Amino acid sequence: MLKDYKSLELDKILQQLANETTCADAAALAAEIEPDTDLKHVERLLQETDDAFVLMAKFGAPSFYGMTNVTNALRRAQAGGVLNLPELLAVAGTLRAIRSVSDWRKKSESVKTALDYRFETLQPNKFLEE
């Protein structure tokens, strides 16, 4: 199967996708995407991709600027640790990006998509952000 990936230049396609991301973790995930053979799963992902395209065509693309992986800092804070200033700024930036994406989706609420469940998991927290 890897021979097929090579002839399709999958690595180059995934690198182009990774270059379009705004977060290092998203770039790493994009570079590791594997083709799927489950028809139902592929159809669902294609519907999500189509819905994302339609939303961006109608309402513009949301900004993910400031999104960083703050998992380690949040775990340490949850365990009672103290965050330093760069960590606090990273958390604030991520919260700001979440609020921005959530606000963007609210502008397009009238359009139902296969992505709705993903947007519904976003929980902006302006108080904590500031």
Describe the function of each predicted region.
Residues M1-E130:
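Conserved amphipathic alpha-helical "coupling/scaffold" segments
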